[in-house]
Amino acid sequence: NQEEFKLNLEELKINRKQKLSSVSYGQQKKAMLAYAFALHTPYILLDEPTNGLDITSRQALKRIISRSMDDESTLLISTHQAHDFENLLDHLVILGKGEILLNRSLDEISNRLLFARTDILPAESIYSEQDLSGHFSILPNEDGEENTPDIELLYKAVLQQPEKIKSMFQ
């Protein structure tokens, strides 16, 4: 879709009149992302799509993804920057040491696990990290409380406590 390609280029602040070979790698990457989403292919595979992008370009990419994806599209993102895509995910696969450690929908994760910030460490905590504001913990979601999974905290928990996390989904 040419109109969408133009819109994506504008969103990512790419000059359409400049030759791709004359711009920086970052600008080339943004142009390729703009093109990929304008194609409306059923599958898009991205490896570290936000590496090398500044904050405004990352935000623009999220807007493009939100606008471009639908129920007929699958977007597979390999990234170490999970927070860049937290609000766009509906399924999560965590890999470690060549194995699939977690493969669940975000709905299932939030139904089974509660991500909570507390002053004291809850006894039932599956995984927790402490900072100046208290403990950020993953707990069993026994009451079905609505919450948003913290992907980075979950990633660390899956790597450090794989059996505990796995047991929450059995």
PLM segments and residue spans:
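ABC ATPase nucleotide-binding domain "signature" loop
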Residues: 51-53
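ABC-family P-loop ATPase nucleotide-binding domains
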Residues: 1-31
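Conserved catalytic motifs of ABC-family nucleotide-binding domains
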Residues: 40
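Catalytic Walker B motif of ABC-type/P-loop ATPase nucleotide-binding domains
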Residues: 44-48
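ABC transporter nucleotide-binding domain
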Residues: 61-76, 80-138
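C-terminal coupling/interaction segments
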Residues: 127-170
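Helix N-cap at the start of a conserved alpha-helix in ABC-type nucleotide-binding domains
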Residues: 55-57
